């Protein structure tokens, strides 16, 4: 398999996320929450493209590594590029538990209130500030995982995919399992990832009980995934768990994970085909155009690569990455003049945007100028 040298050059610094921060004074949970937002590195490459949303609970500790994993994996089209948001509450027991426990009267059982905060305050605020597509993922750990599991079984829930890392399913005599057993179907397709680290006692027992219930009684429209992390502790598992959860939830996302390639039309058919499972038809993102276009060009399907990347720069006209990749594809397709023209556009954007890829783009531009000058010299003889 050929090495994608040009593609690899563009992933050296992908985890330098553009992070913004603001606060919401909630009227529902009587708390001021700090919200941190990591925008995809291609966010400024288009003024109209909207991105799926990933909300990370316990954002103070979990947001940085989840944002970095999402940025890295989406660069290779392993999962969608997403706007990643971290949010925390000071009252986890109160707002992450779906029922009030007799030992915690007045301090538990208000998951419905936190759900209201997410749906009525956080989501509208995010959608007013950023280009958010109507596909929402939420991730939680421990009590946060109990909350995301609770959401997964709620029909009145705008979230499409739910991550529960070492969830506290033992809560209130495994009350969430009773909820599951009484659920026959969900009105919309939902995805639910559950995992467990090397943990003893009620954490492990409740996890096993839930998996047994999931295996014995399927619920229509619920796609669930699970994984053990025996080498991890309760505290360490979110790092590897969230990355694996995202890969599991989007396990069939990459259209060409091996050496095969697809044309633009085949890619469009592929994503249309899987849209029913996800409940949303995802348009191709900048990194998808880049990955699939370069791969086709390097695997000998240069015309396919050119077509994909030409479509890419049409939708992401401010992307120095796509213009530079289009230059590569034109060059491989023996069109050096077109390659140089695309490279000049890439170089101009890279300078304007102070791109971290300026060195690589300048290098290709110099090579293409020399090549075109050489060809012009030969023609003049």
Locate the predicted segments by residue.
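Intrinsic disorder/low-complexity segments in short proteins, especially the signal peptide
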Residues: 12-13, 373, 380
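Non-catalytic cap/lid and distal C-terminal segments of serine-dependent acyl enzymes
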Residues: 18-333, 340-377
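A ubiquitous, low-specificity "background" feature that marks scattered single residues
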Residues: 8-9, 64, 380
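Hydrophobic h-region of N-terminal signal peptides that target proteins for export
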Residues: 5-17
